[in-house]
Structures are given as C-alpha cells and as structure tokens.
Amino acid sequence: MDGIHHMHAVHPIFHATNGFLFAGALSNPHQILSRDPNSNLTPKERTQEAESDEREEMREKTPKRWVFAFAVGFFVLFSIAYSVENLNGSPKVRAVNLGGWLVVEGWIKPSLFDDIPNGDMLDGTQVLFKSVTLQKYVSAVNGGGSYVTVDKDVPSSWETFKLWRVSTTEFQFRSSSGKFLTCDSEGGSVSATAESPSTEETFYIERNRNEVHIKLLNGTYVQATSSNQLLANYQGVPGWDSNAATFEMTIAANGLHGDYQIANGYGHDKAKEVLTKHRKSFVTREDFRFLSEHGINAVRIPVGWWIAQDPSPPAPYIGGTLAALDRAFSWAQTFKIKCIIDLHAAPGSQNGMEHSASRDGSTDWPNSENILQSLNVIDFLSSRYANHPALLGIELLNEPSAPGVPLDVLVSYYWKGYQIVRKYASEAYVIFCQRIGNADPMELYKANIGDVKTVVDLHYYNLFDAFFNNLSATDNIQFVYNNRQPQVQTLNNANGPLVFIGEWVNEWSVSNGDQAAYQQYGNAQLDVYNEASFGWSYWTIKNARKHWDFEWNILNKYLLLESSSSNQIPSNCLLLMLVFGCLYLHHIL
C-alpha cells in the first residue's frame, strides 16, 4: 500500500514535467508553426513536418519511458508484495522472544539449577508428610485456619503443603488456604493459622533420602502422637528407625523454577555469580546479528518488576537485568531491530507460574499495593526508554490469569498503564495481553482502553490442553487454519487495537513428526499469524528443547520463514502485475 501511495505522489510531478516539456508541444501543433515565422512551407507541409518531428521525438523518448516505467513498476510491485498496512508504513512485526534471559525459566535452561543444595526442595515445592508409625498423612483441617492432625489415609489438598525456603535446611509450610504451620512453644501443638511466616513458623528439616525429621528452631522435634495430633514434644534425638518423629516425605510437585527459586535456592552470592554469567552469555550481540540476517525486525524482551530497583532489588532477586536490557537496546539499534519491553513478572505474580517469578504458585498480584508497584515499573521503563530509537512498544503485563485476575481490575490497570506510557512516549505502542484461561477473546476489544497505537497480545500454543494430546500432524495444521485463522480475522476486523500473536512455537504433541511435518506445521502458523495486523513473536530465541529454540529451527530448516504462502505472491501473478503495471505507467507518462 505504501508503494501505491508513493507512486501516486510522484506521478503528477513527472506528468506535469512531461506535459510542460513534451506533451504541451505535441498537443498544439500551432506552437510548432510559430517557431519559424520565415518558413516558406505550405500549411499542409508544415503540419506534416511537425508530425514527423513528433514521431522522431517519441522514438527518442520511448526507450527512456519504458525504463522508467519498469523501474517504478518494479518498485511498486516490491512494495505491494513485501509491505503491509496498519503499522504506519513499516513492515509488520516479525519478532522473537528473548525468553529465559532476564526472567528465568528453568525449563528453558535447566542447568542453571544444577548446583543448588536440596535442589528438589525449592520455594513452591509441594510436599506430603506421612507418619511412619501411624501410616497416616499430616493434614491441615479444612485446608488451614485450624489445628493439624495426622489421620488421613489418602492425601488430597489438605495434606499438601507448599515450601517456603529460608535456607538449605530451614523451611516454612503453607497450607492450601494460604495459612502457615506454626508452633509457639516446646510441647505445643502445631496449627495452620499464621497469616505470614516468621520465627515461630520456621522449621528445620533433617533428611535421610525420603525420610525426614521436623524440629523447631529451639531444637524440639515434632511427632505424631497416638491420638493423631502433631505436637512439638518428642523427647531426645530420633534415629531413622520407626519412631513417632520420623515422617516419609513425598514431593507431589516441584514445577517452579524461576527467579525466586534460583536466587533463594543458591543464596545471594552464588546466585549473583550464576545469573551474571547467564545474562552475559545467553543472549549476545551475535544473536541480534543472527536475527537481523534472518528477517527478524523486533524482539520481545521479558523483564521482572525488580528491574526498576536495579542494581539492588529486594531480596532474593539479583541485580543486573537493567544493564542487560540497556545492552539489548544498543544491539537492537545497531542491527535495526525494534524492542518491545514486556513486564513478564509482576509483584505477587499475575498467574502463579515460574515465568512470573511466583514464590509458590499463588496469584497474589491483584491488590492495590502490587498494582501500584507495577505501574511504577511501567513509569520507570517508559521514562528510561521513551526516546530510544529502538523502542517499539511496552507490554503492560504478560499472561494475567482468569479468573485469578478479575477483568475489571485488569482493565483499570491497563488504562492507567496506557496513560503512563503516553506521558513519556507518543509513538510507542502500548500492548495489552489477553488473560489466559477461561476468558473471552473479545473482552479487551470491548473495554475501550486507549485509542492511539494500542495492541492486544494473544498467545497460541497447540499444547497445554488435553485437547491437543492425540491430534495428528494434519489435525494440528487444520486446527490452525480452521480455528486460529477465523479468530485472527475476527480480531483484525474488530475496529480496535491491532492484533499481535506475541507467543507461538513450532512444537506440538505429535510424537513422530519428521522435518517435513514440522515445516508444514510452521508454514501453516506463519500463513495465519502473518495476517495479524501487528505481527507475531516466536517463543523463544534459545531453549534446551530444540523445537522451542528459534535459532535451532532456522539453522536446521525445521522452520522456513520465507516459504509461507502469505509471504509470497505466485511468480506468474508477479509477472502479470509487473507487465500490466509497466504498460499502464508507459501509457500515462
């Protein structure tokens, strides 16, 4: 479209020039007669001579016109084929996420966690305790808020406790209702009644493989009594035989490996060493060169809320992400790549996942204190990068969950965040991520959040849902065309924010897919996601799981960026368009 506009803007100038120099002389033969007032030719001979001069002049000009027409036609055709509307004359966003870099995700680079002592007992790990003498599970009655018993044969949520790690051997236990186990004195009973943990809620864990002893900080051991109580009154030091102070510990889940887990697991000094090395090596200048050479024009950079307090963020977070983000902007400017800053991890966690730096899987973001702190982070980032030529946009929050984050709370936050960005940057896009979970895809389009350069981000994975588990390669491809494409088209036509597929991946649950199948699947996704009015961003640049790794996919030709049909106009159509364009231009010039 920009090419067409450019042609129309240029054409009248050239046409007027030709009209003045050439066409004007040809359109009125009497002007030619007036050039030689002393001529003895008859009027008929003069007319014939003028026509002969005109034909000679046309023969001289025709080759030049064809060359010019071909050049302009090719430029227009190239612009039509490789430019798009709706992004102020720029190409659509073809981006890659820098996931796992400034916000840690253990599954992206598991080796980061290799040297943590008691590495299977990180913050958020869910554990069960079973008395070896009673063969009953420890249970927080009603999930917490009351006393603790040792009387359940089959464990459920009441018997599941989340670890809050204090040190390698010291822990606090959070019940399913959010209350902490507490014991205020030697000989006292253990209850699940504390709102927040302190000394009385901290216990030592002595471990012998899957067996543990639990004791208070004063050294008194907890035991399961014959009356099914949990009391801090065991006499002496228990051995590892069958006794009332010994419990079998089962790890029910330990899926959280984020910034909180790595920093609190190693402790500050070792975590700083590990993360400093990671931030310097995981994404480098050469990665930006690679992206640029393969047609990527933007990066989406996840950051955590603690970046605003760099270089000395609150414990246990480790400083250094701000300097790394500055480097990314510098590299981006060098290679003409744009940056989207994405608040991926908000205080309190907006979704309970490791990539939001959740401590224990809880979604505690939606309160006034955390929301205000998040807005302060947006203010910090906007003021710092508003005038940087590499800034493309700021995403106010990544993947808030439904129903954990109520829509009205989210919309209010987005509106305030939009105003903050606009205070500093009139040209930056403000990006609102859809809620994940059970949410209406149209809900943000109905919310009327801002009216200038706004974008809605949605994430598409043929994963994370049992629906996709048994789909074949063909089924997955058809799902992209039959389900994703209509939704993208509907959102494109919603007369609201632009549409951004901010995360997608060339991976699925197909166990036997070969290279050709992955190529077809990738092509299908590119066909559809290229239709999004703002563009797309692949998740992620590097990953221990190769099909999630953008660079691996490109180098091994499992993802072919230039082969999707939406990136191409068939060659015969190109040729026809070029011919007709040149004929038309030659005619009007």
PLM regions and their residue ranges:
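Active-site region of glycoside hydrolase catalytic domains
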Residues: S90-A95, G106, A252, S349-V510, ...
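An active-site-proximal structural segment forming one wall of the substrate-binding cleft
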Residues: H278-I296, Y317-H344, A357-G393
